Amino acid sequence: MSDDTLIACLATSPPPLLAAYAHLKHEESVLVTGWRRTGDEEFMVGVRWPAAFGDLPYDPRLLTQTIRQSGLLVAHAVYEVPLTHQTMLDTLDFTVAPRFRAPLGQPSELDVRVTVEETAGNRRAGSSLHMRIHLIRDGVTVARAETEFRWISPRVYRRVRGDRLTFDWGSWPVPAPVAAELTGRASAADVALAPGDGPRRWLLRNNTGNRLLFDHPVDHVPGLTLLEAADQAAQALLAPTRLVATRITTTYYRYVEFDEPCWIEAAFLPAPAPGLCAVQVTGTQSGKEAFRVRLGGVAREGGDAVPPGDAVTPGDAVTPGLRAY
């Protein structure tokens, strides 16, 4: 389906409503543009990415935000999940076409196919939704994800978080970042890592001025922010070589708090195949492991351009196992 056909068929919503569905305060952070039903449990979502810059083939933050926003849009607009409920992302594993690259210097349009495979609880306001998500550009699938969204009521969430629920937003110190080029990012404002106390070890840097990572006040570090920090740690580990990640799996063990240091460590894993590399990144807070991310893909010298192509095929199976909060 062409972009023009999709846009013509999309069930458009006012920008403020799309922002609410995506749990975002700032409309400029909203990537989803509308949706339409294509089957009993299948939907097509329109997505617009801003212009890409830098030496990475795509912005990992836009990829993960696309998955998140598309799933939330379907959950709220179609399945009527209450906006007052807290979202818990139980699983998020994805693969990316090895040669996918966002066009440099110009916005790009994507189609996102969301298939809801199973629903637990009441269908119209279910406690969980299992989704398969395909990102499509020019009719070709360039990324696939499998995820499960869960929701809990405000009352239950208050019980879970206790006295951590209220927090003086932005009151923590923000240390100076590592060099942006070390992480493959375009500017210091995008860097989520600060120098650590040893090699391959960094301090998580929670800069609330980065709206793509911190759109609005929350009581714990968002899971996608931790995933972004892990990607940057993998880039720093390989620098000046760049990791073009094609498979990512993440496990979250506990909430990461703002008022305690969180240490990020990266290490090489055995290569899964000739020409490929794998990295494991762990986050530790108060002496306990808080999350773990494994990234696999191709290392490319000096951020060489990766031409577009190579669709994700059915053989590129996603690996279950992510628990993200």
Describe the predicted segments one by one.
Residues I7, R37-Q86, R200-A236:
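Hot-dog-fold acyl-thioester-processing enzymes
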